[in-house]
């Protein structure tokens, strides 16, 4: 291609997004904040390009982006366009022609949820929407409870405050399938972003019976379903557990404390600065229970009160992080992998003791989660299934068991990123049941003169000292995705033969479905001499490449030393 043609093509692209910008600027937008933002960036090509050169792409996880004006930002027009695309798909599905909606505490989450309801109602689709913020598991449950065609959760999970998102669920309460998402995306592309979505006033939708609030019967059924999954019912009532809990200014406060009170935990101190919904997340810019800074206030309060446990749930309350009190009075954070292994061990041990373990039990974990779980599962005679990253794949395994009439075989699903599910009542991770079972586990070990810490050390003593660490490399901006793609392509074209002096003995490329037997995924697994593994994959929701290290040593220090060597070896490759 000669220089003049390249210049003309670039000029055409610039003209397109500048034209889109001018169209938005000249429109009578319902949100004056969007108009103000557009005026401020007038003449600033880079700012305009970031907002209009591309559109947020709808996938199986829906949409997620920075709040603001333009097709590459989260705003009421992007939400309406996405909902119209979803509505077009729902109208082809038959059945109830109903969609369930929930939302978290993020900026404009309630506004986006109501806008989605208005679009659906205008399309003749019935809506069941929560009357107040409720978390991901509540949305998944309502979708199943009302036999809805789909569900919408307005959230950006644990992202910083400037983000929001639109998660779409299928009729089983699991994230939407690839095929369905592709159809919805095609319908979105046919819909003009400013004028293409049908709209009805929310009050008119209520008056016509098209929009209804989720009933108390559904809410109570959720709590009952969670509490029915207790391993040792009643164990918490006499344990005297002292708890500090933080909902991180998100949606977990009401459902988590309700269930904990129901099972007998009354001594719960809420972190006051993080108690109530606040989408600005003023005390933790990254409201992520994996990050120490998000837990800092909770840990400080735990030290003051002498709490046995500190729990924190992310804004949409599908993930929970914990800290445990050690014998010397200090607090230790427990990783998602460690909690997953502890819960697996506790559930197996308890259900065998109580005679409630199903025949041929099944547990499911993501392939990036610790291999220690496989060893623990085998010890109890549990089939451990490893699936691609993303809880929808765990939900898919539950659906397969359900289709075979064997859903009772499912005992636990978990991801290393602090997501747990111990029952088939929903199809996404659930911090409510995670919190309940963690507390129940602590109560049980106290009742036998032990502790979560002691049990974890006993597991390591029996199976080996596994260390699991996750690092992230961020690639912001429009060029970020291209950089990530080039890095992954380079790793495939020129695979490393060693990392940090450790020979690579096997490479598994999850894009090769014949090799893995799983759907294609952009994941590379390196197995090293001595048993360590390194996994590299781009995040599915954020502009970053994640690396997962699993090392095994006789001591923690030995495992940590190997992890550091491997992490240092990867840095220049992913820089």
Task: Describe the residue ranges of each PLM region.
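Gly/Ser/Thr-enriched, mixed-charge loops and adjacent short helices
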Residues: 47-56, 164-302
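Conserved phosphate/anionic-ligand binding catalytic regions in large, soluble enzymes, centered on
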Residues: 52-72, 156-159, 243, 247-259, ...
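An N-terminal, well-structured beta->alpha segment
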Residues: 21-116, 123, 206, 211-239, ...
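Phosphate-binding and adjacent anionic-ligand microenvironments
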Residues: 303, 307-309, 330-332, 350-537, ...
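Short Gly/Thr/Asp-enriched flexible loops that form oxyanion-binding sites at enzyme active sites
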Residues: 111-120, 163-170, 256, 318-337, ...
